[in-house]
Amino acid sequence: MTKTEQTPEKLKEGIKIPAEKLTTIQLISPTVELLVGGPYKALDGMHTYGHMALRVMTSKEERIYDFGRYGKTGGDFSAEGEGILRVWTDFNSYISGENSYGRTTKGFSYNITTEQAEKVFAHYSSIIAGATKRRSKHPNSEEYKLAQDYHGISNNCATMSLSGARVALPGIDANSSAYNVGNGMGNLEKVAARGTNFGAWPSKIFMPADVQAMLETEKKYVPKKVEVYGKGLK
């Protein structure tokens, strides 16, 4: 076969693909994914509280906002403490850590616009602005001690994730009161939850399992995809 050489002018025209050849160009559309982690079993017993994080993706960048009790803790059931926000730039790094607990994480993905994604990034940037950066314990992540402490009811992984989700998906938790029942909590924990609110049940949804029930039922926003990560309890 004769070798054909192309001049610079020909190269500038680009590569022509024959009509019978098929090619696939994959474009990443802006997406927000609510990640809800389930219970898991550890050496010290069952951990039923669950976890939640928010993943935001565009064609240019990806962030997973992961808030939790990653610092000093205290209070009843260790439900209070330093508010630590981890910001991951690689999903596999984040989810491999969650999978290592033996839990299942369910991801609810929604299409958004680039502008909406940028607003979510800006939302968390404003939270981080007043934070103290800490040395990260994990690759592909940065860690911040926020000005506001962690609280198991009023400022936890679920409330932090929903605060960003609402920026892109206004009203996603508008009917959350119907699902705010404390799934994953023991009876003593529920009594303590009422105690922190002067005997009344907290008004805002705060348990990851309750958020999952809401996302699985409500139709204001229908996820483009629901994906399960990890093998769950054995």
Label each residue range with its predicted role.
Residues 176-188:
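Aromatic sugar-binding interfaces of carbohydrate-active proteins
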Residues 167-177:
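Substrate-binding/catalytic groove segments of enzymes
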Residues 158-163:
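Solvent-exposed, polar/charged alpha-helical surfaces in well-ordered, non-transmembrane soluble domains
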Residues 2-155, 167, 185-234:
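Non-catalytic ligand/cofactor/substrate-binding and regulatory segments of enzyme domains
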